[in-house]
UniProtKB/Swiss-Prot annotation:
One of its GO terms (molecular function) is 6,7-dimethyl-8-ribityllumazine synthase activity. Disulfide bonds: none annotated. The keyword Transferase applies. This is 6,7-dimethyl-8-ribityllumazine synthase. The gene is ribH. Belongs to the DMRL synthase family. The lineage of its organism: Archaea, Methanobacteriati, Methanobacteriota, Methanomada group, Methanopyri. It catalyses: (2S)-2-hydroxy-3-oxobutyl phosphate + 5-amino-6-(D-ribitylamino)uracil = 6,7-dimethyl-8-(1-D-ribityl)lumazine + phosphate + 2 H2O + H(+). (2S)-2-hydroxy-3-oxobutyl phosphate binds at residues 74-75, 117. It comes from the Archaea.
Amino acid sequence: MSEIRLGLVVTEFNREITYAMEELAVQHAKDLGAKVVERVLVPGSFEVPLAVRKLLERDDIDAVVTLGAIIKGDTDHDQAIAQQAFRKIQDLMVEYGKPVALGISGPGMTRMEALERVHYAKRAVEAAVKMVRRLRELEGE
């Protein structure tokens, strides 16, 4: 079975959190025998789907991992952003037939809760790698 090639889409909003997630994801991909071939930084979670689409269009990307932290503010804006972004990410995964792992934590979190969930980046990488392997098995590779 050939090496699994991942693309990362990482939000710049709450960068101190997403930077830690990004570094953890890259290392965990290596530990699992996968390789991150492209990293794309986007301003926030709302912009994630467009970058996901661009990576899914590439032949050298087997799966995409999204990383971000949607923290609760004074309004319900975090809920609206998350709902729209998550739905579009799922739609893109089905449209392109390639795994897209959701490593965006939130909404409704405090900054402290987001920091406590940095390790969720590893779960997202694991999900992407597992799905690529399962799809390859289904396709007889």
